[in-house]
């Protein structure tokens, strides 16, 4: 498997982007890329999550509204490949650890939060593959800081205009 990756320079370069995510190994990246045909079949992350079976379905009939659950109609190989990386990510990934800890008290079953982390990992892999960039652990913090700066700037501007 590693020899095939080394033979294709572009594939090797793009897999390095995915491996920059803590908890994603060469094997996991290769399985996801092989099962999704290099993400070439998808135009957005929502299509990808649906393909993998991470989409949510509702059971409804008339006035009855059942619980929502994961469809599992998608690719079981990707879900199986992302299970262990998700468990590792909640321990070592600086972005996914707070995400997991925030969801954990809200959910009755711990597996629900692990599946949410799996979905987030998959979307992150898709984004890095499409944008051809390495994982940046501070990306979320930088984004929040930019939004806070804009909000503060707007408040100051509004106070100045009303004065």
Features from the language model and the residues they span:
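A detector of single, family-specific signature residues
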Residues: 1-163
């Amino acid at each position: 498997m590693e020899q095939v990756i080394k033979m294709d320079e572009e594939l090797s370069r793009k897999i390095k982007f995915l491996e920059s995510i803590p908890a994603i190994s060469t094997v996991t990246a290769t399985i996801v890329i092989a099962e999704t045909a290099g993400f070439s079949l998808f135009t957005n992350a929502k299509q990808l999550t649906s393909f993998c079976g991470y989409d949510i379905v509702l059971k409804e009939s008339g006035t009855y509204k059942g619980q929502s659950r994961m469809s599992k109609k998608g690719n079981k190989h990707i879900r199986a490949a992302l299970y262990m990386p998700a468990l590792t990510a909640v321990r070592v990934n600086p972005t996914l650890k707070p995400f997991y800890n925030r969801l954990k008290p809200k959910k009755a079953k711990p597996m629900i939060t692990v599946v949410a982390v799996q979905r987030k990992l998959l979307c992150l892999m898709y984004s890095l593959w499409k944008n051809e960039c390495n994982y940046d652990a501070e990306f979320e913090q930088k984004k929040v800081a930019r939004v806070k700066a804009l909000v503060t700037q707007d408040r100051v501007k509004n106070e100045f205009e009303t004065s």
